[in-house]
Amino acid sequence: MSIKLSAGALASLPANIAVPKYRRSDLSAGIIHFGVGNFHRAHQAVYLDDLFNSGAGHDWAVIGAGVRAADELVREKLGEQDWLTTVAEQEATSTKARVIGSMIDFIPPGDAAATLDALARPEIRIVSLTITEGGYYISPATQTFDSAHPDIVFDSRNIDAPKTVFGLIVAGLARRRKAGLAPFTVMSCDNIPGNGHVTENAVAGLAELVDPELAAWIRRDVAFPNSMVDRITPATTDRERRMLHDSFGLDDNWPVFCEEFRQWVLEDKFPPGRPALEKVGVTFTSDVAPWEWMKIRILNGGHASIAYPAALLDIHFVHEAMQDAQISAFLEILTKVEIIPTVPPPPGVDLDSYRDLIARRFANPKIGDTIERLCFGGADRQPKFILPVAADRLKSGARVQGLALVSALWCRYCHGETESGKTIAPNDPIWERIHAAARRARQDPGAFLEMRDIFGALADDPIYVAAFSEALLSLWARGVRPTLGKYLSDHGVAA
């Protein structure tokens, strides 16, 4: 017999499920979080839960918020269980379950008035974001704020009823400024290099369109700390719900399954105050950049490197890709030869050891992370995780054969079928465009590089163009395995 998760059921849960040690009625809100997806609930919410369990920080509970239609479903499902979430931490030989209680409310998505009222509350001192890499209105090629985007233009003309996260933040800050309240800190927790700077440019950039004086105040008085976040967290499916039911006798509308490993490095820049997260393992520093580059280039770049060859070979799970000798060897050589040389090591970190840790995490068979998830949104992810590494290599006169091959594999994937002929379902917000470019590129590889908002100056670099073209033509003429084999043999590895 199973138990349905709710606040009233906590005392009845089996002993092998950890529950909050604090009284949730003692919590009060200090944070509004936009984007209450799986990653937030497996990461920031867990760290806060740890802090609350220690007896500290009870005035830093989370209120959820969102602007997408999908956020309403999350609110509905979490509301049915009193905003509680079950987090199942999985290693190869064990699974541990715990109930997280750090969120205490969720503003109805689409209710701009209620959201703005909440943002104006003096006790709200942090607004945090996990809105995905593609949610920041940044031009992929220039990495600058896209002030001409229709959503941004709309908000600039309707700032009292905005429809974007940034419109709500700007309007909320304007209210606080008018009321003489200190501004809240805006904390991005997305996988973007310099995510604090990117967020500041989006918020201040929109404010500039509304009120230049407000924009100047934001740039002067609002803090946007940079951060590095890390925890592999797959999407939730019925598979995970069944596993929780079968293994723990608990029914959760939207549980989160993740790896045991987690890491959070934060720039210590919170003028209105912050929770004492250093007590529960968060690293605070004055310079997050080395940690960001390490994680984004080695882990996220590694994900991109195995995703597309695995997808084209009909491999479903990430751990299965790591069991493929050729794909795992490609990841190892590419990371050692082309990626790590572009990464300045954080203090006290050995990058080769970090790479080995990443490989072990990818190989965890319990996680159930899918290749489809890693392939999603390549048009946003390639310009953040792969193309800048290639650009840095070219600036130093180094070779980019492996990095160009990763992007060629993405192009081949975007053509829309695997090597066995199976159809690849659209898997990118701009799928129609990249699919059309990939089809043209089968005969003319340069046609894919013509998407200059993605490839930027690389599209005009003859060395990169030649490497990309050679890789793509080989993928079509010879196939994935011979092309990977050629790269490996060029580096002395038997394929």
What are these regions (language model features)?
Residues 1-495:
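Substrate/ligand-engaging "lid" and interaction regions
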